[in-house]
Every structure is written in C-alpha cells, then in structure tokens.
Amino acid sequence: MAATASSLTIASSFSEPRTQIHSSRRLNLPLQYSIPYKVLRSRSRRLGLVVSSVSAPNVELRTGPDDLISTLLSKVANSDGGVTLSPEQHKEVAQVAGELQKYCVKEPVKNPLIFGDWEVVYCSRPTSPGGGYRSVIGRLFFKTKEMIQAIDAPDIVRNKVSINAFGFLDGDVSLTGKLKALDSEWVQVIFEPPEIKVGSLEFKYGFESEVKLRITYVDEKLRLGLGSKGSLFVFRRRQ
C-alpha cells in the first residue's frame, strides 16, 4: 500500500521549442499580361529570360500554450484520470503534452508557480495515483472522488486520494513528504508512511516511500510531470 500511495506523482514544489507549422504550399501567381510564344522563345534565347512560378514564403502558424492547455484538458476530461482512455487517446495526450512542454519556463523547480493545490486530472498509468484502489479489481469496490496534491513552501508535499467504498463509505488515503530539488527540473520527495481515514477510523500503515519527478511545464493553470519510470502526469490548479 505504501508503494501504491507513493505513486501519486509529485510535480514538485520547485515543478521537453515552439509549435511551428510551416506551409510548404506553392502558389502559382498569374502573369499580368501574356506574351506570344514565338516572341517569348525568341526573347528567352537572346535575353535569358526565365519565366517561372513564384513561391510564397513560408508562413509560421503558432499554437500558443493556452490553446495547447485547452486541447489537453479536453482530451483528458471525464476520463477518470486517464482510466477510460484508449491507447490511441493516450498517444494523443502525450503528443499535446510534448508540444506544451516546449513552452516550459527555465528552471521550473525554482519557480514559485509550483506551489499551491493541484488536482491530478491525468496519468498515463492510471493506477499510479491511488495504486490498488484504482486497479481493475479495486475500481469494482472503490470509486475515486478526487486526487489532490498540495505543495507548500518551502518543501512540503501532501498527496490525498479521496475514495468511496461500496457506495456508502467515504475515506481518504494521504501521504506527507519532504521535497528536495535534484537539479533545475527534477525533484525527489520522501514520504512518510501513508495514512488512511475511513469514517472515524484513522491509522498509519506501511513504510516510507520515495518518488522522483521531472517538472516539464508549469504556469498559473497547469503543471506537467514526468515520473522516473516514464509516467506522464497532468495537474490542474485548483481554484
């Protein structure tokens, strides 16, 4: 269970260039007047006149981070954190996230935007946040209500998965950890043993756990994290 809860990835408290679509279409622009073929051929020979089509310069169509964020959130909406998405849909999410991370600020680990309360809206491995509770069997008995990560300055991380058991019993599984910056993008969090609350019952179990996360994007709305085993996490800031 410790490994379970610990998988709730942390886009640390301190947290892959621009989308450019090039137009290679060539436009044939009409001449303003016609030249008789014989005259044209004659002049071409004498003057080396070359008549060719004019190609338009490449035009950059840029998709900004706001558009990418909207697209990303629409792709993961109502997916139970990614559980209901098909393999193809997971690929689409990864592609959009890959474009968005090109806009990441430098040294996201040091950016104060990483602090605050975040909702885990997607994970490429849906069982990572919440562990066994979100496995195929676990979902038969436990419904995930929300997955929250709070990052408090300067170095405290709190993960909480709220669940409903058997349709009538509410509970929480939470982790509290200490955040450490490894470099400008990677952080490490060492968590205390998980704590579970079910009704009036509250207890700790298991052992300490550790996770490492690379912050690949952060702004006022969204944060992206990449786990050490390749799991992609999407965090949306809570209002």
UniProtKB/Swiss-Prot annotation:
- Residues bearing N-acetylserine are 53
Keywords carried by this UniProt record: Acetylation, Chloroplast, Plastid, Transit peptide
Q: Name one GO cellular component term.
A: plastid
Location, primary (coarse class): plastid
Pfam families assigned to the protein according to its UniProt record, in alphabetical order: PAP_fibrillin
Residue span of the annotated presequence: 1-52
Provide the protein's localization: Plastid, Chloroplast
- Which gene produces this protein? PAP8
Q: Which InterPro entries match?
A: PAP, PAP/fibrillin_dom
Organism domain of life: Eukaryota
Q: Spell out the protein name for this chain.
A: Probable plastid-lipid-associated protein 8, chloroplastic
Q: Which PANTHER family does the entry mention?
A: PLASTID-LIPID-ASSOCIATED PROTEIN 4, CHLOROPLASTIC-RELATED
Native species: Arabidopsis thaliana (Mouse-ear cress)
**What family is this?**
Belongs to the PAP/fibrillin family.
